[in-house]
Amino acid sequence: MRKIQGYLFLLACLTTGWIAAQELVSSAPENADVYFIEPTDGAEVASTFTIKFGLRGMGIAPAGVDMENTGHHHLLIDFDGELDMTQPLPVSDQVRHFGKGQTETEITLPAGEHQLQLVLGNYLHIPHDPAVMSYVITVMVK
């Protein structure tokens, strides 16, 4: 009997944790779209260049502001890892956060080919469901 109670308790804990994690993920309209205004895919750019972010079907709100159908930008640079779409996006040189609601930035990259992608995150930096992600673009830094 104690064993069954133990399993039920464990199941309740796991289920509650899963439900709590799911509640942190914000929904996004099916037609939401994040994209690069500039640079365009295949662009040749200087080592320091401006990136402008575009968004359709949703609005921009800073991190910490929980408003329906809003989020803020995250820029993936040469990112080849896996994202846990139920957790806050990590902070690193490859995952840049724009939690103040910025819609453009200036970055410096070394010469060569680089891949860029945008991901919209909610007030907690967690990607929406469905995820609002741009296509990966490639830029050539001179």
Predicted regions and their residues:
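Bacterial N-terminal signal peptides that target proteins for export
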Residues: 1-8
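Short coil-to-beta strand junction motifs in C2/discoidin
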Residues: 65-73, 133
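Short, compositionally biased P/S/T/A/G/V-rich stretches that sit at domain boundaries
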Residues: 23-46
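Short acidic/polar inter-strand loop motif in beta-rich domains
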Residues: 82-84, 121-129
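Internal, hydrophobic beta-strand segments that form the core of beta-sheet-rich folds
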Residues: 110-124, 133-137
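Short amphipathic, basic-aromatic surface patches that mediate peripheral association
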Residues: 54-64
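Short, well-structured beta-strand segments within conserved domains
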Residues: 49-53, 103, 112-120
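N-terminal signal peptide c-region/cleavage motif recognized by signal peptidases
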Residues: 16-17
